[in-house]
Amino acid sequence: MSLRHIIVLVDPNHSQQATPAINRASQLAATSGAAVQLLSIAYRSELDSSHLFDLTDLEKLRESFCSKKVAELNELASPAIKQGIHVSSACLWGRDWVDVLLTHLGSTPCDLLIKATHKTGAIKRFLFGGSDWQLIRRCPVPLWLVREGDWHAGKLVAAVDPLHSQEGYAGLDRKLMHWAARLHELLNMEEHYLHAFMPLPRTLVFDAELVADYDGYARRCQLQHREAFEKLVSQRPVPLPQTHLLQGYTEDVLPAFIEQQSIDLLLIGAVSRGQLDTALLGHTAERVLDQVDCELLILKPDGFGQDSSKP
C-alpha cells in the first residue's frame, strides 16, 4: 500500500477546525515520507455574478479571495513544515465543493483524503451533512474522517465480510487488511479484525426442514462464517485475541464493540452498485457510521469511481 500523497480538505469558513485533520496527516507523513496538500474549496455567491463587475474583474476578485485562503492554509501548515514535512497549499473555486474536489482528485495524485468532521455534542455522534454523505459515497480514494478533540493512535479495527455476495468484496477485504497492517507499521496501532454475522431469524425461516432443525442450521451458519473468517485473518500474524467473530447485526455489534474495546479508528468498506460510481452503503452501514464513537477510514474497491466527477 503506497502512501505518498495526502490531501487534507479544509473548510474555508472554519479553517482552524481543520487542525486535528492536519495533525493526523502530519503523523502519517512523518513516518511515511508522504507529501501533504492542504486544500480549500471556496465560494461566495456575490463573487459568482454581479452587475457591478465584468467577468475579468470578477475573476480577479475570486483570485484575490482564494489567495487569502491560501495564506491562511500556509499559516496552518507552518507547524508541520517546521517538522520537516513537505506541505503545499491550494484553494479552488466552486459552488459544489464535492464535485470540485472529485474533479481535483481525478487529476492530482492522492493516496488518502483526510477531512475533519463535527459531532453532535453530548451524544458523541458524527454530524454528517448532505454533502458529507455525497463524499462518503462517491470519494474514489481512501477517506479518513477525523473527529474533534484528542486522538490516540491506540487501537484500530477492520470490519471485514469474507462471505459478502457482492462481486469484488473479497478484494476490498484484502485492501482493508493491507491498510490495517500499514497503519500498524506507521503509527504502531494495535490491529483488530471483526466479522459480524447473523443467522436468518427463526421467524423468517419457512423451509420445513430448516424449521425442524433450526438450531442445527444456526450452528452450520456459525461454522461457515468462522471458517471463512479464520481463513481470511490467517493472512496476518495477528494474535487470536485480536480477531473477533461476533453474532449479531453489524449495526448493533460494531458500535458496542468499539465502545467496549476503546477503538480509535474503524476501517470499513463501501461497495459499488453495479455500473454506478456511487457507493452502496445501505441502511446498515449508514447506521454504523452515524453511531460509532471513533475516527473512520472508508475504503472502496480498486477501480471504483473511474468517472467519479459525475453524480
For each predicted feature, which ranges?
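A short acidic, glycine-rich active-site loop
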Residues: D57-A71, D213-E227
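Small/aliphatic-rich secondary-structure junction motif
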Residues: M1-D57, K155-V211, Q291, P301, ...
